[in-house]
Amino acid sequence: MNLLGKMIYVEGFMMIMATLLVSMSYGHRAMINDVAEAPVFDDVVSPNGLDSSWYDARATFYGDIHGGETQQGACGYGDLFKQGYGLETAALSTALFNEGYTCGACYQIMCVNDPQWCLPGSVKITATNFCPPDYSKTEGVWCNPPQKHFDLSLPMFLKIAQYKAGVVPVKYRRISCARTGGVKFETKGNPYFLMILPYNVGGAGDIKLMQVKGDKTGWITMQKNWGQNWTTGVNLTGQGISFRVTTSDGVTKDFNNVMPNNWGFGQTFDGKINF
């Protein structure tokens, strides 16, 4: 073989090898993607300072296709449709509910590892209720500690799994709550037991600290009563009221002059801003 022939042969061989290497490299990347535990959703934002890793859990459903039995609940919310949560809700097991401190938090959930029953895609839900443990049973006790379980509304369950599945393995993670409008503050109680239910909370969604201030007082730390209801024994009737709210990711916002001095119990006030 002359010199020109050898050069052509070597160049051709190098081109073939380069093509093979690129093909192998692409194939390796594809294989990694195929075995990844969870996809990345570009439209999902993680809350500041909160763990947004994927974790294992189970999910089932309660209520009917219209959301019956999912209203009210252990978080203290009322009409979930009027309050902006709709059908995108779930009751959480003891391990996730955290004595009500998780109320209002948002999660992304998808069915995994069960090709017979799982459907593609995911749902985004708000924690609005508690799935109580049942210590009288030894089987089907998904909500007993230490198990992590989501009792979804039926419409949400049907987006990720077939009805006949009943219960399915899932992956879940915390996500930022996207809300429309300001945080709302609902008043309950009496002059010596003011109870406030904040709802429609964006960002982390769940509240770890709440303070209240009247026209004639400084900031008063409220006590979490049950669910997401916060209380104080200080009589603030006849005063304009402001709130200071800290969500579980450590973000604090002041909601100034939310309630006028002629406010009454059973009313709801718009905080105008959100997280």
Swiss-Prot record:
It is found in: Secreted, Cell wall; Membrane. It is a peripheral membrane protein. Coiled coil: none annotated. It comes from the Eukaryota. Residues 1-27 form the signal peptide. It holds the Pfam family DPBB_1. Keywords: Cell wall, Cell wall biogenesis/degradation, Membrane, Secreted, Signal. Residues 192-271 form the Expansin-like CBD domain. Causes loosening and extension of plant cell walls by disrupting non-covalent bonding between cellulose microfibrils and matrix glucans. No enzymatic activity has been found. This is Expansin-A23. It comes from Arabidopsis thaliana. The gene is EXPA23.
